[in-house]
């Protein structure tokens, strides 16, 4: 069955062009690995995931929030039911419904007892809280409840300190109905218990007022140099436990006891009526289960046993690096399972990095049994960090195949490696289908090429076979001649240090990202090379079809420089043509996709391409970093397929909407000031256009156009009495502006 998300991404034009581009997130192209169809092939990958639950769509069941701290990306997998069977389905645009201020961590839990899970995330030096104020009528909505949580540290009301690297336990520790917090002291040795005073003061749960109840909760200490846990510790503050206690200051530490990082999961593992904890440490791959010897909360009970090989009844947790555990039911059996993922950005496993332990016990007495080390990832295109897609018919069967390179994948022995995966198109001209053939194409990872190997494809010797020009970390290029027969792919030994027409080694300095493309439209492949520093170099082919000679013609093509907050940009170019017009989609390390036109007459030194959009399709938040693109009509329907690479190691797939026409609308119009009020709207909405009239399209949340209006310059009053409560997108066609409007008519 053809499956797709008919969801329009509306291009927010930054420069007031008369333009409209629409793409659909689309998961209809099947992808196979070892003869198994992937469930979420185009979900984009995951690296350092964190897991929570929320009823995202207000349908009465819990959906899965997956937050990745790589670049604070949010994914939502909605729980669906077909034929009585529950399963997850990715909602690719759900990230738009979460606060932009989310950083480093996300914990979703209902703190005020209204039945809707709220969000706890990072605030400067501590915790920020967003209250869920949504409903089935208006959808998911958030209100900032606390910019920063504070706690009473024995008379001093200070910010409740949680390091940005840590994941605290935010849970009802004493089972009184309000949410408490367990977090490590800044020294990293002692677990502090901050009790929520909402029930004690007001008899309800909707306040966030904390008091440091115990400076050494559980009576244990973690060694500052290892992750060894000392139970029944006899040093201050563990000897006295409950505050007040002068033995340790609330937010200070000695020079040799700087906190590096800890993760805490609190759960009543053995059903004893008190919280046990599972602890991870920044420098280690295991997690330690501590069993609480108490039988009632708030009795200063001690941890009486530890399991550093947890879960010792199954395959122990061993994931590099800095594991964090999450207690979530992900197989819909009513029992919460254990998910474990690394929490150390850029130095942890990033390809098979989510372990699932199935709970074969009960909800009250858990028993965790190892099931997989790639939960969700095993059903995605997933290649570590910094994926980049390439479409080319490598085997001359008339179907474009898919190659995916990466910046790096974690490797325990040598830390990291870069490689290219080959997905053969095993479908048809009208129904593409990709099958993973080789996750390390021609064994490139064994050749010590460094990070971020970047291929370009083209027939450089006019023999009818696609050759490869490979960009390396050291800035040079490597040539692979295609000597394939009809039955198999064979490439000649690599030619290192590929040269230009003068015999000089072509070099981008560092991290060359080449593209072979006939830029000047003379029938011969030219060479464009991205440089780490953010520019593009243009080498014109002054040779022949069979003997190319690349001459450096413009060292700063299009006057482009994508370095933004840092000196580096890592540009990844993708030039393409539609209706004989050349366009450029340019990826970069900042995660933005820049869309350029006016290219064909601007190849000379000093000429600039026209930047049509600095954040193409507004995808940067979902991409996070290391954006890249490949565009082609894969299924012969005259609609462009867009594949998007990103830092989480997977791909997005979108398909061009039939009502869009890339690049033909170029009329520049004056900047338009648009006012919409009141918001939220009630039974009417006033729209004021400052300069000119406009055409208005109104869409609902699932991308259906429900109304089309002509607006005049000046004031326009819209009657909304027949609108249902909810969120609508108001798209002003002439000015390319989109507004999100909440409507509440009752």
Model-predicted segments: where are they?
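Bacterial Sec-dependent N-terminal signal peptides
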Residues: 1-24, 664-665, 704, 727-729, ...
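Basic side chains
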Residues: 2-3, 116, 452, 465, ...
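Acidic/proline-rich low-complexity IDRs
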Residues: 5-11, 61, 181, 524, ...
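Short amphipathic alpha-helical "recognition" segments used for binding
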Residues: 6-7, 333, 362, 428, ...
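Beta-propeller-forming repeat regions
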Residues: 20-664
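C-terminal outer-membrane/trafficking sorting elements
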Residues: 667-746
């Amino acid at each position: 069955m053809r499956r797709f998300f008919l969801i329009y991404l509306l291009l927010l034009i930054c420069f007031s062009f008369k333009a409209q581009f629409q793409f659909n997130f689309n998961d209809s192209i099947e992808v196979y690995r070892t003869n198994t169809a992937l469930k979420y092939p185009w979900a984009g990958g995951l690296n350092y995931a964190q897991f929570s639950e929320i009823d995202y769509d207000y349908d009465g069941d819990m959906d899965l929030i997956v937050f990745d701290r790589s670049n604070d990306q949010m994914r939502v997998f909605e729980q669906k039911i077909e034929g009585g069977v529950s399963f997850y389905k990715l909602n690719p645009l759900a990230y738009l419904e979460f606060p932009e201020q989310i950083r480093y961590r996300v914990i979703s839990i209902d703190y005020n007892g209204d039945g809707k899970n709220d969000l706890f995330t990072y605030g400067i030096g501590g915790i920020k809280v967003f209250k869920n104020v949504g409903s089935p009528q208006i959808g998911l909505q958030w209100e900032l409840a606390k910019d920063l949580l504070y706690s009473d540290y024995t008379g001093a009301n200070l910010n409740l300190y949680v390091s940005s690297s840590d994941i605290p336990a935010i849970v009802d520790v004493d089972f009184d109905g309000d949410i408490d917090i367990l977090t490590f002291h800044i020294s990293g040795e002692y677990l502090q218990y901050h009790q929520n005073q909402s029930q004690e003061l007001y008899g309800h749960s909707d306040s966030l007022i904390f008091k440091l109840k115990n400076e050494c909760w559980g009576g244990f200490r973690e060694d500052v140099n290892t992750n060894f846990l000392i139970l029944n510790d006899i040093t201050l503050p563990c000897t006295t436990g409950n505050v007040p206690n002068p033995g340790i200051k609330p937010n200070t530490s000695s020079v040799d006891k700087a906190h590096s990082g800890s993760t805490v999961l609190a759960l009543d593992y053995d059903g004893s009526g008190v919280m046990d904890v599972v602890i991870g440490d920044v420098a280690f791959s295991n997690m330690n289960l501590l069993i609480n010897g108490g039988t009632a909360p708030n009795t200063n009970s001690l941890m009486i046993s530890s399991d550093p090989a947890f879960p010792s009844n199954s395959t122990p947790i061993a994931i590099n690096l800095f594991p964090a555990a999450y207690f979530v039911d992900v197989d819909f059996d009513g029992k919460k399972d254990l998910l474990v993922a690394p929490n150390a950005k850029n130095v942890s496993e990033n390809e098979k990095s989510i372990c699932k332990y199935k709970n074969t016990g009960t909800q009250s007495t858990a028993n965790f049994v190892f099931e997989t080390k790639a939960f969700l990832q095993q059903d995605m295109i997933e290649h570590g960090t910094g994926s980049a897609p390439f479409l080319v018919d490598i085997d001359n069967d008339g179907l474009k195949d898919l190659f995916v390179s990466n910046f790096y994948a974690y490797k325990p022995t040598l830390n990291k490696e870069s490689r290219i995966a080959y997905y053969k198109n095993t479908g048809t001209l009208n129904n593409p289908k990709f099958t993973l053939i080789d996750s390390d194409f021609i064994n490139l990872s064994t050749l010590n090429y460094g990070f971020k190997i970047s291929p370009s494809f083209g027939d450089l010797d006019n023999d009818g076979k696609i050759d490869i020009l490979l960009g390396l970390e050291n800035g040079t290029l490597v040539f692979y001649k295609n000597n394939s027969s009809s039955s198999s792919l064979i490439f000649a030994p690599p030619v290192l240090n590929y040269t230009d027409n003068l015999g000089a080694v072509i070099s981008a300095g560092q991290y060359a990202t080449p593209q072979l493309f006939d830029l000047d439209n003379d029938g011969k492949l030219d060479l464009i090379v991205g440089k780490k520093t953010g520019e593009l170099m243009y080498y014109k082919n002054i040779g022949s079809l069979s003997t190319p000679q690349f001459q450096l013609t413009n060292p700063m093509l299009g006057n482009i420089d994508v370095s933004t907050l840092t000196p580096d940009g890592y540009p990844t170019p993708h030039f393409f043509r539609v209706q004989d017009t050349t366009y450029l989609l340019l990826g970069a390390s900042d995660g933005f996709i820049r869309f350029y036109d006016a290219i064909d007459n601007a190849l000379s030194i000093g000429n600039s391409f026209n930047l049509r959009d600095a954040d193409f399709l507004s995808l940067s938040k979902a991409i996070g970093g290391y954006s890249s693109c490949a565009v082609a009509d894969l299924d012969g329907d005259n609609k462009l397929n867009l594949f998007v690479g990103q830092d989480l190691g997977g791909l997005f797939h979108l398909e061009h909407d039939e009502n869009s026409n890339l690049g033909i609308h170029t009329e520049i119009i004056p900047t338009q000031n648009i006012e919409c009020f009141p918001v939220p709207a009630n039974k009417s909405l006033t729209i004021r256009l400052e300069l000119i009239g406009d055409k208005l399209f109104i869409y609902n949340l699932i991308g259906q156009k429900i109304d089309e209006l002509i607006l005049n310059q000046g004031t326009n009053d819209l009657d909304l009495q027949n609108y249902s409560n909810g969120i609508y997108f108001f798209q002003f066609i002439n000015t390319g502006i989109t507004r999100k409007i909440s409507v509440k008519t009752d």
